[in-house]
UniProtKB/Swiss-Prot annotation:
It is found in: Mitochondrion matrix. The keyword ATP-binding does not apply. SUPFAM superfamilies: alpha/beta-Hydrolases. It comes from Mus musculus. Monomer. The lineage of its organism: Eukaryota, Metazoa, Chordata, Craniata, Vertebrata. This is Acyl-coenzyme A thioesterase 2, mitochondrial. GO terms for biological process: acyl-CoA metabolic process; fatty acid metabolic process. Induction: In the liver, by peroxisome proliferator (Clofibrate) treatment, via the peroxisome proliferator-activated receptors (PPARs) or fasting for 24 hours.
Length: 453
């Protein structure tokens, strides 16, 4: 009987589907044994749509079919980053009366998350290696997300009923990746597939240095020419950042503005953390910047001097006695920077800027006081007759507001501090913030920079 069933399946269209999106196993139908239900043979399939592959910021539709009515199951997800670090999540579910389970309709009953969370198996992933942040280092290869369906509600003990592997890409089909070595500028430019010119954006990350491309590559798939810009600890750039010379960033701005596939007259800036601070300084000192999105950035120079021509902004003072220790043994440094209202020379002169700003703020950011900084920037701009910036605050969101579905990085090594610190955030609230922030910044840039010519 089993052999003949396999023969039927081999001849069916089900067995012709991509193995990366469909998997099936025989398991027994439910049997009643003295009032207890045990699960016998079923033909479970796990489907993931879009089929086979998708971009990282795309939502997925995950469903299981062929289960027994109301069968309890556990869904598990896993991926490894380029350094071999494992990230995993799991959630307990129960099939409906028809033996189906659709994550868009079925709430998780517990595990890494609970409730109706269709993308929880991604954003709720946690690293096996403590304090490890999920970063995509090579955007030319996908993350492989492994999904499994297990019988019962034990995340490690149930029989595997079905499995699938789904590719999560960071380059939309046709997006062009162009390494940039022009003068001193070290960067990578991402261009949409079709002919331009396109609205241009410079993308800046934080104090970790190097060249991170994954946000720029995803954003290029939305119709922007995006240049991921390195500014230290990459290639032949300086290995440390005692002084941030705005002339380097000016060279990058001029390069992007003059590119034949970039629409003028001005460009946009996107920066997070230290990158947000630098974006604010660029908008204050440099010409040709029409719009800037600052994600949890500082209004003051932090950890190093900012310099442009004959002008310098010294770093804000450190208040070492304000560093706290959490119950988990992490440093909490949110109170460890002097207020720029006290260290006034460290305040970036935003009043000089004619840039239109959007500030995206995690209200549980423990890296520094992002909400306070955004409010003070708004006050200063308005006091000098400038346009009031848009500020969007996200309750319980932490410091690293990434593109959608990246897991929360709530703690980790801070290179300027030289120790592990808490970055704040609650996983579900942070995931909600990331989805909204991603849409908000795209809408903002399209409005301020326009679409392609």
């Amino acid at each position: 009987m089993v052999a003949s069933s396999f023969a039927v399946l081999r001849a069916s269209r089900l067995c012709q589907q991509d193995w990366k999106s469909w998997a099936r196993l025989f398991v027994p139908p439910p049997l009643s044994t003295g009032g207890r239900t045990t699960w016998a043979r079923t033909n479970a399939t796990l489907s993931v749509e879009p089929e086979g592959r998708s971009c990282w910021d795309e939502p997925l539709s995950i469903a299981v079919r062929g289960l027994a009515p109301e069968q309890p199951v556990t869904l598990r997800s896993a991926l490894r980053d380029e350094k071999g670090a494992l990230f995993r999540a799991h959630a307990r579910y129960r099939a409906d009366a028809g033996g189906e389970l659709n994550l868009a309709r079925a709430p998780a009953l517990g595990g890494s998350f609970s409730g109706l969370e269709p993308m929880g198996l991604l954003w709720a992933m946690e690293p096996e290696r403590p304090l490890w942040r999920l970063i995509k280092r090579d955007v030319q290869t996908p993350f492989l997300v492994e999904l499994e369906v297990l019988d019962g509600h034990e995340p490690d003990g149930g029989q595997r009923l079905a499995q699938a592997v789904h590719e999560r890409h960071f380059l939309a089909p046709g997006v062009r990746r162009v390494p940039v070595r022009e003068g001193r500028v070290r960067a990578t430019l991402f261009l949409p597939p079709e002919p331009g010119p396109f609205p241009g954006i410079i993308d800046l990350f934080g104090v970790g240095g190097g060249l991170l491309e994954y946000r720029a590559s995803l954003l290029a798939g939305k119709g922007f020419a995006v240049m991921a810009l390195a500014y230290y600890n990459y290639d032949d750039l300086p290995k440390s950042i005692e002084t941030m010379h705005m002339e380097y960033f000016e060279e990058a701005v001029n390069y992007l503005r003059s590119h034949p596939e970039v629409k003028g007259p001005g460009i946009g800036l996107l920066g997070i953390s230290k990158g947000g601070e630098l974006g604010l300084a660029m908008a204050s000192f440099l010409k040709g910047i029409t719009a800037a999105v600052v994600i949890n950035g500082s209004v003051a120079a932090v950890g190093n001097t900012i310099s442009y021509k004959d002008e310098t902004i010294p770093p804000v003072s450190l208040l070492r006695n304000q560093v706290k220790m959490t119950k988990d043994g992490l440093l909490d440094v949110v109170e460890a920077l002097q207020s720029p209202l006290v260290d006034k020379k460290s305040f970036i002169p935003v009043e000089r800027s004619d840039t239109t700003f959007l500030f995206l703020v995690g209200q549980d950011d423990h890296n520094w006081k992002s909400e306070f900084y955004a409010d003070e920037i708004s006050k200063r701009l308005q006091a000098h007759g400038k346009e009031k910036p848009q500020i969007i605050c996200y309750p319980a969101a932490g410091h690293y507001i990434e593109p959608p579905y990246f897991p929360l990085c709530s703690a980790g090594m801070h290179l300027l501090v030289g120790a592990n610190i808490t970055f704040g955030g609650e996983p579900r609230a942070h995931a909600v913030a990331q989805v909204d922030a991603w849409q908000q910044l795209q809408t903002f840039f399209h409005k301020q920079l326009g679409s392609k010519s």
